[in-house]
């Protein structure tokens, strides 16, 4: 066999071995692992929406959403070809799958994958890129606050009063980020810069819309936090489409 042919054969064998190892690992981790390995491109950041079901009739979906809210679920309705009722958003697939496997989401529940990053900043002038990168960090800060606070109340490790304090601190941080980016991008007429500014303003509005009243009880507070968290994820998905598209 010629040296070049032998090298080609070794290369093919190496690729085949890597592929078989990947298949074996995915099989070990579960069937979903194989799909995720090939559907999730390198560098993409996903969020996972736990949906309680889908409905052809939007009225039925909204009725189901109200029931979900009464139990602490987000009860967010995504209207499309079918209407999907979202119960909660998760940064980790394993966390979403764990809840799904637990059965508390219902027999018709499933996981919906949403792409929220990575969002590049190469569209920005060099002297603004660091500020843009910092501003994009609003998402993780707000998501973590809403997610962890909702779980804390649900687990009785946080009171609604505690939640108000945490949310207020989060809002102050995002407001500072908004102000810093506004100063850094002053004079820029780039539409993508404007989109990022709007994303920061929207995040602040979502925080302001969280209903944390002792009057309505902990389930309502948890539901409100999860509802705004789902909205945050969908807004980030839209921003990703603009800045990374």
Q: What kind of region is each of these model predictions?
A:
Residues 1-10:
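Short, low-complexity patches enriched in S/T/P/G
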Residues 2-3, 25-41:
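Short, charge-rich amphipathic segments
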Residues 10-30:
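Hydrophobic membrane-insertion alpha-helices, especially the h-region
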Residues 22, 33-34, 137-138:
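Short S/T/G/P-rich N-terminal loop/turn motif that feeds into the first structured element of a domain
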Residues 33-128:
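Solvent-exposed beta-strand motifs enriched in subsets of small alpha/beta binding domains
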Residues 43-49, 149-152, 208-216:
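Acidic/histidine-rich, surface-exposed loop or edge segments in extracytoplasmic proteins
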Residues 127-206:
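Alpha-helical segments in soluble extracytoplasmic regions
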Residues 190-245:
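Extracytoplasmic/luminal low-complexity segments enriched in Pro/Gly and acidic/polar residues
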